[in-house]
């Protein structure tokens, strides 16, 4: 059945035609090749915005540094990073006056949270730069290699369990004259080949101890690894993003938590809330501005865009901000909060894989790794790259990294930078003129409302806001920001016109088949349609069309057309046979060639439950047989989570209900990784999995509380097994012989 996708817009009000301007269905663009060029671009741009600042050489790392704070004020409209510290502090003073006690309460809460945070908080997070192997690893692995390497240097803070002692270790590690650590080296072995003459060279990954000097270690700790941002739509050029190492992560966490406590209590902040809560906050802000508008006056809204938000901000401003916010806190906590900005103002960017060059005859290609970029004649590069390298030269270090003291990398201090933006919005007026401004800020995105008696005064207010932002190192783009009468604007991809416009086109890419398995995909598909009806104003006719489109897509994906259709194919043969032999054909799942009985009333019910009473008994028995080897009962209990990719923004986690049946299979992981040096990671993971299974066998409770106390897992398990054995022995469930054997085993482990 072919359906015209534009039927999706049958019953939608005209403003929602915005949905038709987001034709984001296909695959987004992914980057390939080297990201070095994009990273160098970022380094050059960041320094250009700060080039009139104070320049000096770092005593510790020997890197070229630039400090743009209190630099010359701009005379044109070009972006600049010259934030004036006294202006930043004054803006925060005003925020403190407007919200009495907010800073103290936020600091107190952040401090109390820090005291009870355990090291395992750092295992959350995706890729983390691992200083022992100089590449990205999953956060948990990077933390593990750091802790095991720290132990070699008598730094055992992590064993205490708290984040604070581990952070103390990090500070101590920066003072050690040299650091010993475990790294992975490949040893090449020549082996005679079995099936032919000659030799095979086998690479064997070995864990070896290595050591580096203090300066080398500090440089690694301050390094950010850079990659190219993938799946970014609507842009011709890709851009670079950065991953911090484990040394920086712990300190950033606390500062962000402090800023989050502040953002939660600022009505102008679009973080950390999202979804419908954010819409409510926005609607309140609009209503408030309209009600404050002078009689006969005018209210304008600027949909704002900031030029290079991250690259014009400066860690030194953030240092001043944390110092001001934590003014009444104990000195140790103030010091703790100041570490992240200090580390960031000395950061070093790794430049990635390097450039590819071809020989003059165009026959040979070679990759030039970053340390060697300047060791070959510049004329070997193309013009564009040559120009980049010339500008990069002053900030280049011989290890193939670049010093990057000004600017922040993407996504590092979202909350704290939001506080800075809100501070600018909170000033409201300059020099008691006839206008008032207010607005909303969410990381680098903002909306500005201005009330005044006429349009000219509104424009004056907007210009004053523009200049105020310049003093804080924020550059509002005059080209990309646009102004309307209040009641129509866009903020964080939410379009407002006398209320929020339904915009489910953002979700269109996620309407497809998720590709988990047949059972989960059906549940996810229906849940997404349900969520869009609840949250994004999708109407009933649209939803009905979406269901039909989804079912068609699902049948094509899994080759499971209806049993009475004319489609041929291997799977269809089996499905047709099942169709012929089934009485209750309505009871067959769509994946087994059954009809679709989903409609708007039953979207929330898993398909197996919906069709349960319509199934033939023998079909039901096969589908839901607990001993059926294809039924993954353990992994499919209760509520599941799936990753959903909307057109804008990060991947979202979504809960869905599914009932396990023969269609709930799980695929095995790709094992082609086995011969690489990642193999150690997998073996370690398997080891952890075995430990956790053992632990679960000893403590078979459904929910684990967060462990408190200083017991190791081994002690806890031995203790529990001793108790269990004694209870079993005393109640007669265990013979004396077995009891003594059990105790002897526990004795061998060293616990009795």
Swiss-Prot record:
Family (UniProt): Belongs to the influenza viruses polymerase PB1 family.
Domain RdRp catalytic: 286-482
Chain segments annotated as transmembrane: none
Alphabetical list of InterPro entries matching this protein: RNA-dir_pol_NSvirus, RNA_pol_PB1_influenza
Main subcellular localisation: host cell
Documented EC number(s): 2.7.7.48
Source lineage: Viruses, Riboviria, Orthornavirae, Negarnaviricota, Polyploviricotina
Keyword field: Eukaryotic host gene expression shutoff by virus, Eukaryotic host transcription shutoff by virus, Host cytoplasm, Host gene expression shutoff by virus, Host nucleus, Host-virus interaction, Inhibition of host RNA polymerase II by virus, Nucleotide-binding, Nucleotidyltransferase, Phosphoprotein, RNA-directed RNA polymerase, Transferase, Viral RNA replication, Viral transcription
Protein name according to UniProt: RNA-directed RNA polymerase catalytic subunit
Single Gene Ontology BP annotation: symbiont-mediated suppression of host gene expression
Enzyme class: transferase
Subunit organization: Influenza RNA polymerase is composed of three subunits: PB1, PB2 and PA. Interacts (via N-terminus) with PA (via C-terminus). Interacts (via C-terminus) with PB2 (via N-terminus); this interaction is essential for transcription initiation.
Region (Promoter-binding site): 249-256
Annotated compartments: Host nucleus; Host cytoplasm
A single GO cellular-component term on record: host cell cytoplasm
């Amino acid at each position: 059945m072919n359906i015209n996708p534009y039927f999706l817009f049958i019953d939608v009000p005209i403003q929602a035609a915005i949905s038709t301007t987001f034709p984001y269905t296909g695959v987004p663009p992914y980057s390939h090749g080297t990201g070095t060029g994009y990273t160098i671009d970022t380094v050059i741009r960041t320094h250009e915005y700060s080039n009139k600042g104070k320049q000096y050489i770092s005593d510790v790392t020997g890197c070229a540094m630039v400090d743009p704070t209190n630099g010359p004020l701009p005379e044109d409209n070009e972006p600049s990073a010259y934030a004036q510290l006294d202006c930043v502090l004054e803006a925060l003073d005003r925020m403190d006056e407007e919200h009495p006690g907010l800073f103290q309460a936020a600091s107190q809460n952040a401090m109390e949270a820090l005291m009870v945070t355990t090291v395992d908080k750092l295992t959350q997070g995706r890729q983390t730069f691992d200083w022992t192997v100089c590449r990205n690893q999953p956060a948990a692995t990077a933390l593990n290699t750091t802790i095991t390497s720290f132990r070699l240097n008598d730094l055992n803070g992590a064993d205490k369990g708290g984040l604070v002692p581990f952070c103390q270790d990090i500070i101590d590690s920066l003072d050690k004259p040299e650091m010993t650590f475990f790294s992975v080296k490949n040893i090449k072995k020549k082996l005679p080949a079995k099936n032919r003459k000659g030799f095979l060279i086998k690479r064997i990954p070995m864990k070896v101890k290595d050591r580096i000097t203090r300066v080398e270690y500090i440089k690694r700790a301050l390094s950010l690894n850079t990659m190219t941002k993938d799946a970014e739509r609507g842009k011709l050029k890709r851009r670079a993003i950065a991953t911090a190492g484990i040394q920086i992560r712990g300190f950033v966490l606390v500062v962000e938590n402090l800023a989050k406590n502040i953002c939660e209590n600022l009505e102008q902040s679009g973080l950390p809330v999202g979804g419908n809560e954010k819409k409510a906050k926005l609607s309140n802000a609009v209503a408030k501005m309209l009600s404050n508008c002078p009689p006969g006056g005018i209210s304008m809204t600027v949909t704002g865009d900031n030029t290079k938000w991250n690259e014009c901000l400066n860690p030194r401003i953030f240092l001043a901000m944390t110092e001001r916010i934590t003014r009444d806190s104990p000195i140790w906590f103030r010091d703790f909060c100041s570490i992240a900005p200090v580390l960031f103002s000395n950061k070093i960017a790794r430049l990635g894989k390097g450039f590819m060059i071809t020989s003059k005859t165009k026959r040979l290609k070679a990759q030039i790794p970053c340390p060697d970029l300047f060791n070959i004649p510049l004329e070997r590069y193309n013009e564009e790259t040559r120009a980049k390298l010339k500008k990069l030269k002053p900030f280049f270090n011989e290890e193939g990294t670049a010093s990057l003291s000004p600017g922040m990398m993407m996504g590092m201090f979202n909350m704290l930078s939001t506080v800075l933006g809100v501070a600018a919005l909170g000033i409201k007026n300059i020099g008691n003129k006839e206008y008032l401004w207010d607005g909303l800020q969410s990381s680098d995105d903002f909306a500005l409302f201005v009330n005044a008696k006429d349009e000219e005064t509104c424009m004056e207010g907007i210009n004053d806001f523009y200049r105020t932002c310049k003093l804080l190192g924020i550059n509002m783009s005059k080209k990309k920001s646009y102004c309307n009468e209040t009641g129509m604007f866009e903020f964080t991809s939410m379009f407002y016109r006398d209320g929020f416009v339904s915009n489910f086109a953002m979700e269109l890419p996620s309407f497809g088949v998720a590709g988990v398995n047949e059972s989960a995909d059906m549940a996810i598909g229906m849940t997404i349609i349900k969520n869009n009806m609840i949250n994004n104003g999708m109407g009933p006719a649209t939803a009905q069309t979406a269901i039909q489109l989804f079912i068609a897509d699902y049948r094509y994906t899994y080759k499971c057309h209806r049993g009475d259709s004319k489609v041929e194919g291997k799977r269809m043969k089996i499905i047709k046979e099942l169709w012929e032999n089934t009485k209750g054909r309505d009871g067959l799942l769509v994946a087994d060639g059954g009809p679709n009985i989903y409609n708007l009333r039953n979207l929330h019910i898993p398909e197996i439950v919906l069709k349960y009473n319509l199934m033939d008994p023998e079909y039901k028995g096969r589908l839901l047989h607990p001993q059926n080897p294809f039924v993954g009962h353990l992994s499919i209990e209760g509520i599941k989570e799936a990753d959903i990719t909307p057109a804008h923004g990060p991947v979202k986690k979504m809960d869905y209900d599914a009932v396990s049946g023969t269609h709930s299979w799980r695929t095995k992981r790709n094992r082609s990784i086995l011969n690489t040096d990642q193999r150690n990671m997998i073996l370690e993971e398997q080891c952890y999995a075995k430990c956790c299974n053992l632990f679960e066998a000893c403590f078979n409770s459904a929910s684990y509380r967060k462990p408190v106390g200083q017991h190791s897992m081994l002690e806890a398990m031995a203790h529990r097994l001793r108790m269990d054995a004694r209870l079993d022995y005393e109640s007669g469930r265990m013979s004396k012989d077995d009891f003594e054997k059990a105790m002897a085993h526990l004795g061998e482990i060293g616990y009795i």
